Swiss-Prot record:
Protein name: MOB kinase activator 3A
N-terminal signal peptide: none
GO MF assignments: metal ion binding
Keyword set, alphabetical order: Metal-binding, Zinc
Family: Belongs to the MOB1/phocein family.
InterPro entries according to UniProt: MOB_kinase_act_fam, MOB_kinase_act_sf
Positions annotated to bind Zn(2+): 83, 88, 165, 170
Keyword Zinc in record: yes
Summary of the function given for this chain in its UniProt record: May regulate the activity of kinases.
Pfam families per record: Mob1_phocein
Length: 217
């Protein structure tokens, strides 16, 4: 039986933006393969996120940040036709949580935006971070900057907000496509990873606290 969610994922018109990949033959490509092999083997996600012996933490984090960016991008891309200026005039996670956009360019102060506008700015911003050689060096031997993990925390905290919005405001669409299991697995993978390395503040996780307690016990 075909899965409509997977059809949406692989429909080029629905793909939010091109996937960032690792160059074959590089250390990160090998790490990415190792991480994917663990997932495909059905390894407990708590174990799958742990740093493999002898590997560099920053490289391991880089591989996962890129992977999560690609996966969350696809998840949002599949429900984006139902996330409009009219349906989601404010980027939020239910009535208690509103997310305002701030950057170093146009929005220097936290600014209320519609969810689709926020998402567009967010994905552009993360893509720029990932492609910044000073922050995510691709050459072997080039050291990571001292603020690397601090920058990653900001990226992952903002990516988490996509999960919040999708789960709270668009879960009916996810259910309609029969893709709860896929999205839940992506979420659990993300959650176990950020918890393993302390990459998101507990208060940022609050909006999905009850769901997470049920899902990630």
């Amino acid at each position: 039986m075909s899965n409509p969610f997977l059809k949406q994922v692989f429909n080029k018109d629905k793909t939010f933006r091109p996937k960032r990949k690792f160059e074959p033959g590089t250390q990160r490509f090998e790490l990415h393969k190792k991480a994917q092999a663990s997932l495909n083997a059905g390894l407990d996600l708590r174990l799958a996120v742990q740093l493999p012996p002898g590997e560099d933490l920053n490289d391991w984090v880089t591989v996962h940040v890129v992977d999560f960016f690609n996966r969350v991008n696809l998840i949002y891309g599949t429900i984006s036709d139902g996330c409009t200026e009219q349906s989601c005039p404010v980027m939020s996670g239910g009535p208690k949580y509103e997310y305002r956009w701030q950057d170093e360019h146009k929005f220097r102060k936290p600014t209320a935006l519609s969810a689709p506008r926020y998402m567009d700015l967010l994905m552009d911003w993360i893509e720029a971070q990932i492609n910044n050689e000073d922050l995510f060096p691709t050459n072997v031997g080039t050291p990571f900057p001292k603020n690397f993990l601090q920058a990653v925390r900001k990226i992952l905290s903002r990516l988490f907000r996509v999960f919040v919005h999708v789960y709270i405001h668009h879960f009916d669409r996810i259910a309609q496509m029969g893709s709860e299991a896929h999205v839940n697995t992506c979420y659990k993978h993300f959650y176990y990873f950020v918890k393993e390395f302390g990459l998101i503040d507990t208060k940022e996780l609050e909006p999905l606290k009850e769901m997470t307690a049920r899902m990630c016990h």
